[in-house]
Amino acid sequence: MAGRRLTWISEFIVGALDSDKYPLVKWLDRSTGTFLAPAARNDVIPLDSLQFFIDFKRECLSKGLHPRDLLGSPITAFGKICTTSRRLRRLPGEEYEVVQGINCRRWRLLCAEVKECWWCVHARTHLHSGSSLWEILYQHSVRLEKHRRRPRPFVGENSDSSEEDHPAFCDVPVTQTGAESEDSGDEGPSTRHSASGVQPVDDANADSPGSGDEGPSTRHSDSQPPPADETTVHTDNVEDDLTLLDKESACALMYHVGQEMDMLMRAMCDEDLFDLLGIPEDVIATSQPGGDTDASGVVTEGSIAASAVGAGVEDVYLAGALEAQNVAGEYVLEISDEEVDDGAGLPPASRRRPVVGEFLWDDGPRRHERPTTRRIRHRKLRSAYYRVARPPVMITDRLGVEVFYFGRPAMSLEVERKVFILCSQNPLADISHSCLHSRKGLRVLLPKPDDNNTGPGDVNLLAAVLRSFASGLVIVSLRSGIYVKNLCKSTVLYHGNNPPKKFGVICGLSSRAVLDVFNVAQYRIQGHEHIKKTTVFIGGDPTSAEQFDMVPLVIKLRLRSVTCDD
């Protein structure tokens, strides 16, 4: 029976305490649910007080509890059943108190969710709603800090620690002329090019890249050190010749350059391939297998055939494709099913990797990873729910709350808590209901309406409005403003200074978004003579923010920092 939440136990105990039928069973503090009951350590207990435990035992048998759970004395069975079902808890400290010569134990009644109570049903989600709103605001503040700390790309940013003297352009080192190019060592001219494998060509020779009159020395003047006076002039203006581009524009430009070079190579396939790729003749003559110069990025038809014969593969192009290495990493090799039958001859990693037809330069999803219509609609709904116009400053501020029933003040207090729920309470519930417990200040309950705090109006209308306000409002008071999440299904209106388009206009409080109903920055801009508080209207549409006598429930929220400015 441990862990079973038997609400009828709490109802029986509360009814017995309120009836005053048993003299030694009485309340210590009804607001906290503490009471006294005779303990089992007494030798003699009055019969009128012992009758409480006998009636409790009969109630347990009528509710279907097994007799073996009621073994022992009625007082021992009472303590065992109430503690194992989590209905009672012993008070810490002094457990016993002597009343009329009888030792009485101090008990605390634990709350429970009553299914028949409308307020207990909605109180179940209050803890999650409060923590989720605080997490939403915290994520927006962290996102703003990351956006501020994000380094913007600029000319001269180092992409690698080994190339400190060379400026970077879209994570690609830019080739410089002069004495700095001599430090490349054994890397070869191909390692100093951009990702597309294209080297700058002079405008005079752009129309005839394949002409061999001037040789590679005119098209690759950066591989030879120029005179000292020219070096000084060129290095001084190297930043002036470069243009600052963002990542997307730079990648798009490189993509078009790569396409043009591909078309150019296909159109001039009869020319010298080494001459077209821009490799100096002295490098070609001295480059031998195992030498210092790295020319692994260049794949020719001869090298493909030689590697195929050495590997014993009949298909020459397949062998070259297996051994070719993509230095820049910008092209994806695709082998059709006609060339390879069921992946024969390919390594296991190549068979597991999905084949992509085209390369996507942006960071968007692939074709097979694009979301469906249902996911898109769900993301739009969640983005609207978590949308916050201005990122908050996560510093808690004290908030003043004023409540009016038909224009008459019903409650006024100050809340100093990072998040709380303002809701109504069940006027007929007892202390055993979970909706009457504040959960350490999380839940702030509106007072019960009576003749002293209710103005001239329809009492039944006020009762219906308070019933619809059982879920309440989640409120977070920060130095940057007041943030509210509406949990009510009924129509809720508010009058505040945010958004600026609806300044001074009574508008609806959406239940699908977190709204900044009062913004401190907007208050500073408008001046101190304008709106200083936010007014929430529930159950009626007022003619103005000052005349709300005919509205059943009105709540005014005001920050302490704004009050101190007056």
From Swiss-Prot:
InterPro entries: Interferon_reg_fact_DNA-bd_dom (IPR001346), SMAD-like_dom_sf (IPR017855), SMAD_FHA_dom_sf (IPR008984), WH-like_DNA-bd_sf (IPR036388). GO terms for biological process: symbiont-mediated suppression of host antigen processing and presentation of peptide antigen via MHC class II. Transmembrane segments: none annotated. It comes from the Viruses. Residues 151-170, 176-236 are annotated as: Disordered. Keywords: DNA-binding, Host-virus interaction, Inhibition of host adaptive immune response by virus, Inhibition of host MHC class II molecule presentation by virus, Transcription, Transcription regulation, Viral immunoevasion. One of its GO terms (molecular function) is transcription cis-regulatory region binding. Belongs to the IRF family. Interacts with host SKP2. Interacts with host USP7. Plays a role in the inhibition of host immune response. Interferes with the transactivating potential of cellular IRFs IRF3 and IRF7 that play a critical role in the induction of IFNA and IFNB genes. Additionally, interferes with surface major histocompatibility complex class II (MHC-II) antigen presentation. This is Viral IRF3-like protein. It comes from Human herpesvirus 8 type P (isolate GK18) (HHV-8).
